[in-house]
Amino acid sequence: MSKSPVAIIILDGFGKRAETVGNAVAQANKPNFDRYWADFPHGELKAAGLDVGLPEGQMGNSEVGHTNIGAGRIVYQSLTRIDKAIEEGEFQENKALNNAFTHTKENNSDLHLFGLLSDGGVHSHINHLVALLETAKDKGVKNVYIHAFLDGRDVAPQSSLEYLETLQKAISDLNYGAIATVSGRFYAMDRDKRWERVEKAYKAIVSAEGEKFEDPIELVKASYANDKNDEFVVPAIITKDGKPVATVKDNDAVIFFNFRPDRAIQLSNAFTDKEWDHFDRGADHPKNIKFVTMTLYNPSIDAEVAFEPIEMKNVIGEVLSNEGLSQLRIAETEKYPHVTFFMNGGRNEEFPGENRILINSPKVETYDLQPEMSAYEVTDALVEDIKNDKHDAIILNFANPDMVGHSGMLEPTIKAIEAVDENLGRVVDLILEKGGSAIIFADHGNSETMSTPEGKPHTAHTTVPVPVIVTKKGVTLREGGRLADVAPTMLDLLGVKKPAEMTGESLIQK
């Protein structure tokens, strides 16, 4: 039977900004997007700050965006939850955190804090690290050591010195704690099974393998002199009197303070997985450690969780499933967790009638080297699926504008957007041919802002609104939409009643 599918098409990191300087979206040749914009109802969506459950003025990101899209409601994010817990005193009494503190006291051992050192608010926040230091001191933990992962991606490429200085000031004010290792997130926070990267971070933390520096500031400056920005700082060891400040040893406790799971899973597994076979962890692999993660990274990780997920009922996948509609989730590796786990409200398993296609992202050092990434392969697989009338609903993500946008390089990002546009045309024209419709939009901004006002590369997400197109003639879109309104719009196009839990509203004016 022929199907007329309704698709959610996410152009990841494709924001809307009037200024064309440093704007890859505006400068790209994108005839298909421009044609849909001209021919169909369009507008913009809010995708940052309070509109997606983040603090006011906080840029959106893919995890937050896809969670809000799938939920059809504003979902208060981990960043906001943890901030609130610190403010209201719940953080200090958190059971999992206190279990880590107790473990060190009972074993006369050390506490180690792992995480991304910035105020980017995408994976972590430096305020949470400072709160952990204050709380550990209050609770009588004797020694605490920080293993700092440098950002340079959700914040400026060379901004780690200011975060290290903020951290050193907190250490000095509290007269408590020390930085033990420093690593660029490229190594410590890989999510693409590049195990040789994770191994470098792991061995720095456990075996003090790596270059030695007495001062983290000098370490970063040496890295810059070597043309390696924060993200790419090779894992290195901080020493005192010629000896490593600290390594993770038997009976220690670890708190991984990243709240976003995807880039914290592999390193967590390196410490906790009993069946590990990705690299030789060596004789130093610590035994009997208490491992605590800020949020649930993956149910398979042997760790206590400080902030358990809030279960959500009636996300888009569940509603489609309950209606007996078939649905496809499709993306390349970089954004596959977003169209599955995050879109399903933090649920790994499929709903009945939900199918998934994962296309591998290319194995390149950085995506500016291959701006098209796997967009053509994703599209080939999807076109085949649509031609064969497989699914009633489709959720697709094109990763390129975001992943190449993070390079801070304008030309490759323009190429990335042009590749996406070509593939967007193939998908949407086929859907229209089948009598279906698509909601084309982005989860957050990035590629529309590739340079700072000073003309330096801009690699982070932004707070700008994102464009939205609904490829259905004869309807009008209301203004003031946000990401939470996308799922209700899909249901509207499918003729399905929106459940009470979805507080978002269809973008189509009645």
UniProtKB/Swiss-Prot annotation:
User: Matching NCBIfam families, A to Z?
Assistant: pgm_bpd_ind
Cofactor(s) of this protein:
Mn(2+)
Q: Where is the active site?
A: 62 (phosphoserine intermediate)
Q: Which residues bind Mn(2+) 2?
A: 12, 62, 443-444
Q: Which residues bind Mn(2+) 1?
A: 402, 406, 461
Organism, per UniProt? Listeria monocytogenes serovar 1/2a (strain ATCC BAA-679 / EGD-e)
Q: Which HAMAP family match?
A: GpmI (MF_01038)
GO BP annotation list: carbohydrate metabolic process; glucose catabolic process; glycolytic process
Cellular component annotations (GO), alphabetically ordered: cytosol
The record describes its quaternary structure and partners as: Monomer.
Residues annotated as binding substrate: 123, 153-154, 185, 191, 260-263, 335
Cited InterPro entries: Alkaline_phosphatase_core_sf, BPG-indep_PGM_N, Metalloenzyme, PGAM_B_sf, Pgm_bpd_ind
Sorted keywords for this record are: Glycolysis, Isomerase, Manganese, Metal-binding
Q: How is the cofactor bound?
A: Binds 2 manganese ions per subunit.
Q: Which reaction does it catalyse?
A: (2R)-2-phosphoglycerate = (2R)-3-phosphoglycerate
Instruction: Give the family, as the similarity comment puts it.
Output: Belongs to the BPG-independent phosphoglycerate mutase family.
* Gene behind the chain: gpmI
Summary of the function given for this chain in its UniProt record: Catalyzes the interconversion of 2-phosphoglycerate and 3-phosphoglycerate.
An annotated Gene Ontology molecular function: phosphoglycerate mutase activity
Q: What is its EC number?
A: 5.4.2.12
- Pathway it acts in? Carbohydrate degradation; glycolysis; pyruvate from D-glyceraldehyde 3-phosphate: step 3/5
The organism's lineage is: Bacteria, Bacillati, Bacillota, Bacilli, Bacillales
The entry's protein name is 2,3-bisphosphoglycerate-independent phosphoglycerate mutase
